[in-house]
Amino acid sequence: DSLAIDVRFPVANLEALLARLHYVEDHTSQGSLAVVIWTTTPWTLPANQAVAVNPGLDYAVVQVDTDHGQERLLVAKPLLKDSLVRWQIECYRVIACGPGSALEGLMLHHPFYDREVPVILDDHVTTEAGTGAVHIAPAHGQEDYAVGSRYDLKVDNPVGPDGRFLPDTPLFASLHVFAANGRVIDTLKAQGMLLRITRINHSYPHCWRHKTPVIFRTTPQWFISMEQHGLRARALEEIKKVRFTPDWGEARLQDMVAKRPDWCISRQRYWGVPITLFTHKQTGELHPDTLELMEQAAQRIERGGIDAWWELDPIELLGTDAADYVKVKDTLDVWFDSG
């Protein structure tokens, strides 16, 4: 059972939007104009960096009368009737239409922060539910992160490892994300950006061990690049040298290697083989003597076990550089460790 909200993202430049659409003959319209998004995770809105539409869908601007008076709202045409029912709006007029592809680059006002966010295109936007416009928070979802990377969006993660907003987060500092849902909704109401709030029953990921809801948040990790030094190409060539039984195994492995993303080899656990690196406190860059330091760390671990790394005082290896560097506490993916 979750709260679902429809939120206005006001169009920053009305002329820029209307110039991209096809008007209905003899149309008349008035009031503010907003793109409406629908979300079941209000707490992710502080991290919003864009609104995505499907380039292959048709969108409509409708003239409606709401509690805020006359206004114009943009929604995907296949979801128009369902959206109007959800908004409890019976009378409306379609005043303009156009493809989602025409909306790319349009700038919108964030619903409660003083910044503008772009409209971007993403084929993952569907007509299963909502409005056909999806708010994008690259810090809080795999698909959001992927489309955000394509558009070079800022990955702004305002949530700490304890599930609370960071102390410098405007309006929601130190609030737990689930407790912040109510604060976000109140803020949207105060700003006049909340169009509708409903409750829905839907599936949501839970921790298999604790049976509690989980959240998605970006964190710094270590990766092995599939492209640098030609790793993917070399792996594909080596596969050709292997005899497979049955034969179809070769095509399957080739497909897996050809499509796989970079390998995330780091984990945040209290046990496991340590990643013996030191990173600069300010820049995050590796220490310039990293290879030599890894060899020294390996020798210590060979003598004293993996606890030798956890017990190591950085000054023992870095000397005066220790003041500027942090010892990495991540562990290796067990599949990497297995060889």
What do these predicted regions represent?
Residues D1, D82-A96, L103, T290-L317, ...:
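Amphipathic alpha-helical
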Residues D1-P46, T66-H68, A102-M107, R115, ...:
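Residue patterns forming the tRNA-binding/recognition surfaces of aminoacyl-tRNA synthetases
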Residues A50, L57-A133, Q142-A146:
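Protease-associated
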Residues F112-I120, K329-G339:
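Active-site-adjacent "gating/activation" loops or surface patches in catalytic cores
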Residues V119, L194-L195, Y325:
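Generic structural signal for residues in well-ordered beta-strands
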Residues I136-A139, F178, A323-L332:
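Conserved phosphate-binding loops in nucleotide/dinucleotide-binding enzymes
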